[in-house]
Regions:
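STAS-like cytosolic regulatory interaction modules
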Residues: 1-38, 50-110
């Protein structure tokens, strides 16, 4: 799993991309947890595009868990949903493992 928090913009997107691509040399599945990202610039989206191409080329199954800021930019820049998105890390892990997420049972007061 690769997790980022704070901001991903032109100042650090290259570092993010380089780190993510370096992980791709030894994995078959990847979850990119961006749920704690507060600002996500167009350079961050470009990073996800590069990562998507690499994962496709290397047959790496991957999922992204976006924050509100990331989801907003994906809605604008990725209308065809080429970046795979899950609502939570647990959901992403289950999807990559080929399992359905567990049902969470909650007791209801009588």
């Amino acid at each position: 799993m690769l997790a980022a928090r704070g901001e991903i913009d032109a100042a650090n997107a290259g570092t993010f991309t380089d780190y993510a691509l370096a992980q791709c040399t030894r994995i078959r599945r990847l979850v990119v947890d961006l749920s704690a990202v507060e600002f996500f610039g167009i350079a961050g989206f470009s990073s996800l595009q590069v990562l998507s191409e690499r994962c496709t080329d290397d047959s790496i199954a991957w999922q992204t868990v976006p924050s509100t800021a990331v989801r907003r930019l994906l809605r604008i820049c990725d209308p065809t949903a080429t970046v795979p998105v899950c609502d939570a890390v647990d959901d992403a892990l289950c999807r990559l493992a080929g399992r359905r997420p567990s049902l969470e049972l909650v007791t209801k007061p009588r």
